[in-house]
C-alpha cells in the first residue's frame, strides 16, 4: 500500500525547502509595457524573452510603486514602500551622502542567510556613501560587478556607446567624475567601454553559477541591466541591427543577454532547478522620442503614476514548476522578496513588508493574495500621501502630475507642464475596459452606477488607511551631496573630475 497523499506532499515540501531553487532576477531599465514582442510590439527583436514568456508565466498586471530608478530598485530589493526607507524625493546622484539604509534587509541578505551564493551585475543606484558604505557588498551580495548609478550620471563625451568609436548621444551630467565600473569595491575602469560591458556581465554571471554548483549551494543572481536606459549602447553584434535605432539595438542586446544566461543555465544542467524572473524598474522615458521606448496602449510613461509609468512587463520561468500561461492577477515588484523567501524556505525579516507571497500563483496552487496597489509620485510628501490606488479592475487618481521624463507624447497630461493637480472626486478608471485611462467614470458622478460608487468608496478608504499607516522615513536624498564622495580611480588626485580617468583595458 502506498504512502498517504498527505505524507507524499509533506515529503515533497520538505525536499523543496531542503534544496531551494537557484534564482535569476533580471531587471531592465526604462522598459515600456509595449516594448517586447510578447507584449505586442510588432517589430521588436526579442526572441529570447518571447521564449521565456511562451514557456513561463506572463503577467499582464504587474506594477512598481514608483516610476523612477532609485525608489523602484529599493522597493524591489526590500519588499517595502520606498517612502518608509527615505528613498525619496527623486533619485540619488554620484555625490549623494545618503543611500539604502543598512538596517534595511534586502532579498540578497535573506537568501545569503539561507546559504545562497549571491551576486549582482549591472546598475545599483541605491547610493555609494563614505568608503562605499551603501554599495552591494554591504547589502547582502557576495559579489558585485557594475556601475553604482545610472550610466548617464557622468559626462557622456568620454563614453563610447557603439563600436568602434561612436560617442554616446547627448552631454549627460557634466562636472562629475566619469562613470566607474566596480568589481566589489574596487574600480575596474573609469569609464568602462560600454560596448563590451554586457559580455563582462555574462562572464561574471556564468562564474557565479558555476562556482555555486561546485560548492553545492544555490545561487541568486541579480542582473540589473543598463538596457534600455538613455543613452543606449550595444556591442558590435547588435549595432544598427534592430531596425529600431539605438533603442532597438540596446533592447536586442538585452534580449541576447537573457539568451546567454539561459544557455549557461542549461549547459550547467540547472534549468529545472532555476527560477528566472524578468521585469523592469519603470515605464519608458518618452521624452527621448525614438530613443525612449513604448508604453503600448497605456497612458504616459516614466515619472508618472499613470499606467504607462507603473505597469511593467513581467515573466516567471521555471520548467517543471511554473506552468506556461498568462495571468491577470495583481502583482508588484514589492512581492518578490516574500515570494522568493517562501520558495527558498527562508524566514522573512522582522519589519513591515508591503509585499505578498506569490508562490501559490507561480506554482499553480492558488491566486495572488494582493488585492490592491498604491502608487507614489517621484517627489512624494506626507501631506498628500498616495497619488493613485488600484483595487480589482478599478484605479483612482487622487492627484496627478506630469513629468519631464514623459514629455513629447501627444497627451499633455503626461508633460512636465502638467502641474500637480488634486482631484475631488478622484479620476476613476475601469482598467479592464480602459487600460489607457481615457474615460473617467466620475466625469458625471450623478450618472455613476452603484458598482462604480462602491468602488470609489473602497478606493478612498484604502488611501486613507495606507496614508494613516505609513510613516515616511528621513529622506536619504535630502541628506545632500558631498563631491568628495564621488568614486575616483585615483583617490586624492587633482584636478577633479578630469584626473579620475583610468582607461578600460577591454576597450
Curated annotation (Swiss-Prot):
Result after altering residue 136 to S: In MLD; late-infantile form
Annotated consequence of substituting residue 156 to R: In MLD; adult type; enzyme activity reduced to 50% of wild-type enzyme
Disulfide bonds: 156-172, 161-168, 300-414, 488-500, 489-502, 493-499
A GO biological process held by the record: lipid metabolic process
Result after altering residue 314 to T: In MLD; infantile-onset
Residues bearing the modification 3-oxoalanine (Cys): 69
Native organism: Homo sapiens
Chain positions recorded as Ca(2+) binding sites: 29-30, 69, 281-282
Consequence of substituting residue 82 to L: In MLD; late-infantile-onset
Name the record gives this protein: Arylsulfatase A
UniProt xrefs under Pfam families: Sulfatase (PF00884), Sulfatase_C (PF14707)
Record: active site: 69 (nucleophile), 125
Residues annotated to bind substrate: 123, 150, 229, 302
Record note on what altering residue 282 to S does: In MLD; enzyme activity reduced to 0.6% of wild-type enzyme
Known outcome of mutating residue 274 to M: In MLD; severe; 35% of normal activity
Regulation: Inhibited by phosphate. The phosphate forms a covalent bond with the active site 3-oxoalanine.
Example GO molecular function: calcium ion binding
Listed result of changing residue 52 to P: In MLD; loss of enzymatic activity
Record note on what altering residue 381 to E does: In MLD; uncertain significance; early-infantile form
GO CC list: azurophil granule lumen; endoplasmic reticulum lumen; extracellular exosome; extracellular region; lysosomal lumen; lysosome
Keyword Hydrolase: yes
Cofactor notes: Binds 1 Ca(2+) ion per subunit.
Disease as annotated in the protein's UniProt record: Metachromatic leukodystrophy: An autosomal recessive disease caused by abnormal intralysosomal accumulation of cerebroside-3-sulfate in central and peripheral nervous systems, as well as other organs. MLD is clinically characterized by leukodystrophy, progressive demyelination and a variety of neurological symptoms, including gait disturbances, ataxias, optical atrophy, dementia, seizures, and spastic tetraparesis. Decreased arylsulfatase A activity is detected in urine, leukocytes, and fibroblasts of affected individuals.
Impact noted for substituting residue 370 to W: In MLD; severe; no enzyme residual activity
Highest rank taxon of the organism: Eukaryota
Record-linked CDD domains: ARSA (cd16158)
Keyword vocabulary terms for this entry: Calcium, Disease variant, Disulfide bond, Endoplasmic reticulum, Glycoprotein, Hydrolase, Ichthyosis, Leukodystrophy, Lipid metabolism, Lysosome, Metachromatic leukodystrophy, Metal-binding, Signal
Amino acid at each position: 500500500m502506498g504512502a498517504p497523499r498527505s505524507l507524499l506532499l509533506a515529503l515533497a515540501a520538505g525536499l523543496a525547502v531542503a534544496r531551494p531553487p537557484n534564482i535569476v532576477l533580471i531587471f531592465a531599465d526604462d522598459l515600456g509595457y509595449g516594448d517586447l514582442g510578447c507584449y505586442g510590439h510588432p517589430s521588436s527583436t526579442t526572441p529570447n524573452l518571447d521564449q521565456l514568456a511562451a514557456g513561463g508565466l506572463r503577467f499582464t498586471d504587474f506594477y512598481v510603486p514608483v516610476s523612477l530608478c532609485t525608489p523602484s530598485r529599493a522597493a524591489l530589493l526590500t519588499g517595502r514602500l520606498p517612502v518608509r526607507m527615505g528613498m525619496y524625493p527623486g533619485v540619488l546622484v554620484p555625490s549623494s551622502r545618503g543611500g539604502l539604509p543598512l538596517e534595511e534587509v534586502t532579498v540578497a541578505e535573506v537568501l545569503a542567510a539561507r546559504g545562497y551564493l549571491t551576486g549582482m551585475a549591472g546598475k545599483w543606484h541605491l547610493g555609494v556613501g563614505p568608503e562605499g558604505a551603501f554599495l552591494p557588498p554591504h547589502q547582502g551580495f557576495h559579489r558585485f560587478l557594475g556601475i553604482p548609478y545610472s550610466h548617464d550620471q557622468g559626462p557622456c563625451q568620454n563614453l563610447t556607446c557603439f563600436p568602434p568609436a561612436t560617442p554616446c548621444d547627448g552631454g549627460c551630467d557634466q562636472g562629475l567624475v566619469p562613470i566607474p565600473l566596480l568589481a566589489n569595491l574596487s574600480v575596474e575602469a573609469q569609464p568602462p567601454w560600454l560596448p563590451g560591458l554586457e559580455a563582462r556581465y555574462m562572464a561574471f554571471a556564468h562564474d557565479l553559477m558555476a562556482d555555486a554548483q561546485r560548492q553545492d549551494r544555490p545561487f541568486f543572481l541579480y542582473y540589473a541591466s543598463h538596457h534600455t536606459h538613455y543613452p543606449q549602447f550595444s556591442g558590435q553584434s547588435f549595432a544598427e541591427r534592430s531596425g529600431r535605432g539605438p533603442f532597438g539595438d540596446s533592447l536586442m542586446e538585452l534580449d541576447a543577454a537573457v539568451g546567454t544566461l539561459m544557455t549557461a543555465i542549461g549547459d550547467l544542467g540547472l534549468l529545472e532547478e532555476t527560477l528566472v524572473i524578468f521585469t523592469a524598474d519603470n515605464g519608458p522615458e518618452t521624452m527621448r522620442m525614438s530613443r525612449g521606448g513604448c508604453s503600448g496602449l497605456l497612458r504616459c510613461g516614466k515619472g508618472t503614476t499613470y499606467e504607462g509609468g507603473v505597469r511593467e512587463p513581467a515573466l516567471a520561468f521555471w520548467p517543471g514548476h511554473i506552468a506556461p500561461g498568462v495571468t491577470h492577477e495583481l502583482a508588484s515588484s514589492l512581492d518578490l522578496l516574500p515570494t522568493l523567501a517562501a520558495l527558498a524556505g527562508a524566514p522573512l525579516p522582522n519589519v513591515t513588508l508591503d509585499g505578498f507571497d506569490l508562490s501559490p500563483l507561480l506554482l499553480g496552487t492558488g491566486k495572488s493574495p494582493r488585492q490592491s496597489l498604491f502608487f507614489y509620485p517621484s517627489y512624494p510628501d506626507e501631506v498628500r500621501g498616495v497619488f493613485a490606488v488600484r483595487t480589482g479592475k478599478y484605479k483612482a487618481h487622487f492627484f496627478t502630475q506630469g513629468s519631464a521624463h514623459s514629455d513629447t507624447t501627444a497627451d499633455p497630461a503626461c508633460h512636465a507642464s502638467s502641474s500637480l493637480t488634486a482631484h475631488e472626486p478622484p479620476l476613476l478608471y475601469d482598467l479592464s475596459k480602459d487600460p489607457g485611462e481615457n474615460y473617467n467614470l466620475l466625469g458625471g458622478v450623478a450618472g455613476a452606477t452603484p458598482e462604480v460608487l462602491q468602488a470609489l468608496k473602497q478606493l478612498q478608504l484604502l488611501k486613507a488607511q495606507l496614508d494613516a499607516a505609513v510613516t515616511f522615513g528621513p529622506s536619504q536624498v535630502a541628506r545632500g551631496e558631498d563631491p568628495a564622495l564621488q568614486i575616483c580611480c585615483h583617490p586624492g588626485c587633482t584636478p577633479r573630475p578630469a584626473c579620475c580617468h583610468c582607461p578600460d583595458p577591454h576597450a
